[in-house]
Amino acid sequence: MSNFVDVLKKKKINHVVNDNGSIVIECDLSLLGRADITSLPDNLSVGGSLYLRGTGITSLPDNLSVGGSLYLRGTGITSLPDNLSVGGSLDLQGTGITSLPDNLSVGGSLYLRGTGITSLPDNLSVGGYLDLQDTGITSLPDNLSVGGSLYLQDTGITSLPDNLSVGGYLDLQDTGITSLPDNLSVGGYL
């Protein structure tokens, strides 16, 4: 953790280290290109967005909270911790992610394009876009709600689940879907 705090001090990032060792940063934190950063401390809270592209990070700490967006594109991340909280978008494109934790809630968009993800957890909540293009996804969970558009192009999905709700555009191009459920709700183009 001292290496992480040293980086914060060097970058003149206002932060608070609480008595329990947790670190609170109220603004955005960009660690872009910092290959020397290989881990983050447990119980880290970032009020703004967290940019980790080009770091040596391969896992995220327990109880990470990001008020803005979390950018992990192109990192060595292969899994996400339980209790991850992301208020904005979560960008996992180009990572080794193959699964998501149960009850994951993403306030903004969730970008999974080109990952090895093969299924989505129950109770997944996405406030913005959900991009599953070019993934190994073959089915969607029942009661999935996506606030923005849902991109399913070039997936193995052959049917849509009951009670699917999409606030924006539903992209079914190059899927095996041949019929739509009666209770499908799409706010934009289909």
Predicted regions and their residues:
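N-terminal capping/linker segments that flank leucine-rich repeat
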Residues: 1-35
